[in-house]
Curated annotation (Swiss-Prot):
Its cofactor is [4Fe-4S] cluster. It comes from Microcystis aeruginosa (strain NIES-843 / IAM M-2473). PROSITE patterns: MTTASE_N, MTTASE_RADICAL, RADICAL_SAM, TRAM. It comes from the Bacteria. This is tRNA-2-methylthio-N(6)-dimethylallyladenosine synthase.
């Protein structure tokens, strides 16, 4: 490849899927001879892997792009790439807004980055957003960690939630084969990785698009069976997965998590709203009663399991009483962590053009009230850790205190304790918890 920039920088916005995509694209760039630059302003190639789930994330991308577009006016050899969901959604329109961009690459094309770059270096301005079958991973990702790793098991989403752009920007569901997933995990185990998170926009949909059904009519491939299939991969000591959908979540999956010792006691199951009418308007496909039953089933079999979720406030037409149903659900379930957001109208989604939009003031007020309750309930949940001995996988140094290291419990609770990172990085350490906060813990080596 001619005229290759020597140094590259990737800025990633949004979800774990985007982070995994960025790692794959970084691996492609390094296979092509590029070297990582910590400072974007010193890089010859800059890639923004973008998120369009909310408007503020999208506007941040344009702010970053504007600065680098000005730089390109004096450094014409700078290569600007926009990847991810904004790239997919905006396409040619993004080029009209920021003509300095060289390559626009949607999520389904991430594995084609090398071929598309060749076209750029040959003098073309390239837009790759057409729906395609995703190429199997053929490049070793440049992982941000050598302890934990993400492994995609399914791309895309077939749901049609009325607020969500994901199906439009990430395409239909495409499952990787069990053999390909296990092979990637085996390679990670050989490289010394300890923990893997299996990823999917709707991980419970895994296998529905793969060929074959059982005699009873069940899909031959499903996520629960996949967990059993990959559980014994050598070297991998912990398994996590995200994200689950209440509509498809099964008791069989809970039982598998209970039986398989490597699977961590943590479930991320977004509920989005605690009101049935809002859930119906969102086209989520379940009721708050069904969601409560899922959590009850988990806690019956795994009483100490950590539960995290996502919630949206201020959905079009949401009344005060309907919002209070969300507060009631959060209060009664008690989440270990809850990712909250005020509703943000996204272009191309049905809810964005409804007449009953709420004011920003109302949405902000409800978000603040929900966040206050979330912190209160998380603090209550943290109390169960006080005095306990927890197994912590040490990942890094505490960025706020160099004398401490940090890692996570099996329940995904961030934990800090005094220790030497050079000695402890990548090791499992028994820690006695001496201090608890809503979303983190402090302890001492036991």
């Amino acid at each position: 490849m001619n005229k290759s920039p020597r140094r590259y920088h990737i800025t990633t916005f949004g979800c774990q899927m985007n982070k995994a995509d960025s790692e794959r694209m970084a691996g492609i760039l390094e296979d092509l001879g590029f070297q990582w630059s910590e400072d974007a302003n010193e890089a010859d190639l800059i890639l923004y892997n973008t998120c369009t789930i909310r408007d503020n994330a999208e506007q941040k991308v344009y702010s970053y792009l504007g600065r680098q577009a000005k730089r390109k006016q004096t450094q014409p050899d700078l290569t600007l790439i926009v990847a991810g969901c904004v790239a997919q959604q905006e396409g040619e329109q993004l080029l009209r807004r920021v003509p300095e961009v060289d390559l626009i690459i949607g999520p389904q094309h991430a594995n084609r980055l090398g071929d598309l770059l060749q076209q750029v270096f040959d003098g073309s301005q390239v837009v790759a957003t057409e729906p395609i079958h995703i190429m199997e991973d053929i490049t070793k990702p440049r992982r941000d960690s050598n302890i934990t790793a993400w492994v995609n098991v399914i791309y895309g989403c077939n749901e049609r939630c009325t607020y969500c752009v994901v199906p439009g920007v990430r395409g239909v569901e495409q499952s990787r084969t069990p053999a390909a997933i296990r092979a990637e995990m085996a390679q990670l185990g050989q490289q010394g990785y300890q923990e893997i998170t299996l990823l999917g926009q709707n991980i419970d949909a895994y296998g529905r698009d793969l060929p074959g059904v059982t005699a009873s009519g069940r899909h031959l491939h499903n996520f629960t069976d996949l967990l059993y299939y990959v559980h014994d991969v050598a070297g991998i000591e912990r398994l996590r997965f995200a994200t689950s959908h209440p509509r498809y979540f099964t008791e069989r999956l809970i039982k598998a998590c209970q039986e398989l010792p490597k699977v961590c006691e943590h479930f991320h199951i977004p509920f989005q709203s605690g009101d049935n009418d809002i859930l119906k308007a969102m086209k989520r496909g379940y009721t708050q009663e069904k969601y409560r039953q899922i959590i009850a089933n988990i806690r019956d079999l795994m009483p100490d399991a950590a539960i995290s979720a996502d919630a949206i406030v201020g959905f079009p037409g949401e009344t005060e009483a309907q919002f209070e149903n969300t507060l009631k659900l959060v209060d009664e379930i008690g989440f270990d962590q809850l990712n909250t957001a005020a509703y943000s109208p996204r272009p191309g989604t049905p809810a964005a053009i409804w007449d009953d939009q709420l004011s920003e003031q109302v949405k902000s007020d409800r978000l603040q009230r929900l966040n206050h309750l979330v912190a209160t309930k998380a603090a209550e949940r943290s109390q169960r850790y006080l005095g306990r001995i927890e197994e912590i996988l040490v990942e890094d140094v505490n960025p706020k205190d160099a004398s401490q290291v940090m890692g996570r419990t099996r329940g995904n609770r961030l934990t800090f304790f005094t220790g030497d990172i050079e000695e402890l990085r990548g090791k499992f350490v028994k820690v006695k918890i001496t201090e608890v906060r809503p979303f983190s813990l402090t302890g001492v080596i036991f």
